[in-house]
Regions:
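Predominantly transmembrane beta-strands of Gram-negative outer membrane beta-barrel pores used
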Residues: 1-8, 14-60, 67-75, 83-87
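Outer-membrane beta-barrel domain signature, strongest for Gram-negative TonB-dependent receptors
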Residues: 65-171
Length: 171
């Protein structure tokens, strides 16, 4: 069993970070929201730029991924706390149909690979009241996943789709 916990944000001062990696960039915030530091925010967002790298390399597919997470926590008193959390992603893969003189391998991949869009998230809210001998915790949450695959004849969007798949799940 795995137990993962998001920590609270920094109650005393703003901290931020910009991240530039080989394939993505991101931003993180870790900060008080209220003057007294009882409400804090911890948040991050990341986005790939693989689509630009893959295009320069002449690859026939151009992926992009995005993900985010956050926790907004508020200490309502010595024994009470409220929080909101979220974690999610949205990704898509499109075909590089602008290749000049694609080779046989590129043509093969362009011929069968569909484009897709995918997203997922979980959001939750919780309330905690601490007693001397225990605690009361009330939590509500929602999660969802969407996956769409599609392919057009000869990769021409004015022609009919040969693949049109869409699934959505949520709890």
């Amino acid at each position: 069993v795995m137990d993962m916990r998001m920590r609270d944000g920094n109650p005393t001062r703003f901290k931020g970070k910009l991240i530039l990696g080989a394939s993505d960039f991101g931003i993180n915030f870790d900060t008080p929201v209220s003057r007294n530091g009882k409400t804090t925010l911890l948040a991050s967002y990341r986005r790939s730029y693989l689509q630009m790298l893959f295009s320069v390399l002449g690859l026939p597919f151009l992926p992009t991924y995005n993900d985010y997470q956050f926790k907004l926590a508020s200490k309502l008193g010595a024994s009470d706390e409220f929080y909101l959390i979220g974690l999610g992603s949205f990704d898509y893969n499109r075909l590089n149909t602008g290749l000049k003189d694609p080779d046989d391998d590129q043509k093969y991949i362009l011929g069968y690979l569909p484009e897709n869009r995918q997203s997922s998230y979980v959001f939750g809210a919780g309330y905690v009241h601490r007693f001397r001998a225990g605690q009361l915790r009330v939590v509500v949450s929602r999660n969802a996943f969407t996956n769409k695959l599609y392919k057009h004849e000869r990769n021409d969007k004015s022609l009919p789709r040969t693949i049109d798949y869409n699934t959505e799940q949520s709890d």
